[in-house]
Amino acid sequence: MVHRMMPVVAEAAGLPFKHEPVVLRRSRPQVRDYVIHKFDEDLPPADLNGLQSALRLFGLIPDSLELRPTMIDLLTEQIAGYYDPDSNALYIPADIEPFQLRVVVSHELVHALQDQYVRLDSIITQRHVNDRRSAAQAILEGQATVAQIPVLMPEQKPDTLPLGWFWKQRTVMAAQQAQMKEFASAPLWLREGLIFPYLGGADFNVWFRRKYFGRSILDSMPRSTEQILHPERYATHDEPTELAFEGRAGDVKWEDGLGEFETRLLFQQHLGNEAEAITLATGWDGDRYQVLGANADVLVWYTVWDDAAAASRFAAGLQRAWAKRRTVGRSDIKQLTVSGRPVVRLVYAPAGWSGWSSIPTIKLSGGGE
């Protein structure tokens, strides 16, 4: 099957295979063991605790949710096969249904092809650059989603689909996955985060193939989910502004950024309106947060915006969103100007936090309109 699919996948992806990957069968317990191994490798205990604290402080996951078992159960439920860069092999569950086999192999075969041109491990294991990593995952999963279509439906030409078509299938995909126990009970951040790389990434790939016919997206990958959501920003080389915290390194439990897509999810989670969330996150140009404190109970989040209007709109929305979530500490949302750029700062911490008088500051570099 793999040998027959390879020419079609190669043509759809616009890249020839350098060699044929191996296909191996695995039992469900072996698949789960692989998920656990990869999860623990990607998020060692200190990183896991830091990320979990951040997500709780943002209100993206409940305080009662333990991230590790939740994600392991969810990923185990979702995985119908996988490509492992370490062994250059496709792994297929031994109990996979025949009708699923072509779908899984065609998709994972694209990942095997991608790995022959870029080091997948170096892309998907980037640390403390969440938004850039999310954008890269969207390219990889989106390309695989688009390239597998000619294998499964030769009469369908992905390049003829209207732009945005894949994202419009999100409700259908979510409804199908909602029949799965772990997915149905997962927080919005997890559910949407699983779907976005496939559908949002597929839409970007279709746009790229039309705009830059004959070029490989793997040669110049987007650096932010903003560029995935707004491809014209990629075309105009609108790179995100880099934010760097100054001082307090010894007190930091975790540091990263949300990006435009997860900023959308933050508003969608707390305000319950997707259209409004999209509006409030539009104009994002960069962000960075730190989790501080002995108990990892302090959040300092800076966002930089394309213009003052976008910053004001975001700040007002954040005030409403934060008022709607259950908080036990003190919060402070301020509009600032840093290096001539409009910035919004959120601080959420216990009222007695000693750092209220010396809140960490940031410096900016790159980006901008």
Can you say where each PLM-predicted feature lies in the sequence?
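Extracytoplasmic/secreted envelope proteins and their assembly/folding machinery
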Residues: 2-6, 10, 103-107, 141, ...
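Post-HExxH zinc-binding segment in Zn-dependent metallohydrolases
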Residues: 5, 115-121, 125-173
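Short pre-active-site segment immediately N-terminal to the catalytic Zn-binding motif
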Residues: 90-106, 129-136
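Catalytic glutamate of the conserved HExxH
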Residues: 104, 108-112, 116
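Pan-zinc metallopeptidase signature
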Residues: 178-302
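C-terminal soluble interaction/assembly domains
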Residues: 285-369
